[in-house]
Each structure stands twice: as C-alpha cells, then as structure tokens.
C-alpha cells in the first residue's frame, strides 16, 4: 500500500474492502488509547498535537495532567482534563482545536455530560479558568438542560 508523503505502510486487505463504520457518538479517548499513542501519526492524520503532560511540573502543563482528546465524526476536535471529587466530574481544563467547527463547544459539553453519566456522577463542576467563554457557556447550557450543575 502507498500513501502520499508516507513511508512504507501495510494494511489488511480485508479492512480495505469493508467500509469503515464511524463511531456514532463523540467520545473522549484516554491518553493511552491505541488511536493516539503514536504521537507523530496522530499529528499526521488528525493535525492534532498530543502531549502526555503527567510528568511535567504543573506550571509547565498546557492542557492538563491526564488530558483526554475528543473524537467526533472521525476528527479530534478538542480535549479535556478531568478529575472526580465528591460525586462530581470536575473539568479541570477544556479546549477546542482551531479547526473544530461551529458546533464543537456543544459537542464537547454533551460529551462531558455523557461521561459523567457513564461514571455515575450527577454533577459536573468546572474549575475556575478551565475553559474559554464559548466552552463555558456550552457547558452551562447542557448542564441546565439535564439538571446537572456547573460550578465556576
């Protein structure tokens, strides 16, 4: 198999004959997910720079200790760093990629809501300064609709 601007590549012939099934809902990926563990490939395929910042001093982190990229419609459109405290999902940092599109803030907010539900939390809290005004407004909108609370 040849791909323009790539070195040698291999693909399972069966995988090339079946149409890919997109994941129906946006999903946060953990930093060790097979899709993103090889950073140069992620940069090449998604134009997404992912750095695992857990070993950096807190003052040098850009996105957070254990940041999770957000996969939506086959693109990495944002990222968030989460913590769990006293029955709440705390968003310590949330941001969108420049190419994310006009609905990305709402998608990120709904994805935070889904994650909170999956892990059994009934509250979402937003750390002070964790997100820009667009993302913060989207989180407030989603949380109000679902009776979850966002605390600045």
Residue ranges and their predicted role:
Residues 1-152:
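Long, charged, low-complexity, helical-prone intrinsically disordered regions
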């Amino acid at each position: 198999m040849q791909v323009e601007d790539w070195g040698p590549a291999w693909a399972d012939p069966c995988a090339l004959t079946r149409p890919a099934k997109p994941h129906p809902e946006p999903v946060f990926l953990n930093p060790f997910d097979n899709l993103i563990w090889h950073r140069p490939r992620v940069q090449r395929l998604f134009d997404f720079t992912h750095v695992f910042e857990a070993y950096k001093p807190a003052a040098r982190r850009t996105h957070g200790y254990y940041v999770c990229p957000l996969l939506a419609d086959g693109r990495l459109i944002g990222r968030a760093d989460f913590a769990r405290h006293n029955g709440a999902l705390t968003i310590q940092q949330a941001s969108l990629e420049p190419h994310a599109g006009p609905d990305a803030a709402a998608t990120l907010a709904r994805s935070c809501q889904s994650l909170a539900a999956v892990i059994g939390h009934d509250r979402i809290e937003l750390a002070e300064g964790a997100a820009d005004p667009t993302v913060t407004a989207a989180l407030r909108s989603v949380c109000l609709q679902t009776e979850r609370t966002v605390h600045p």
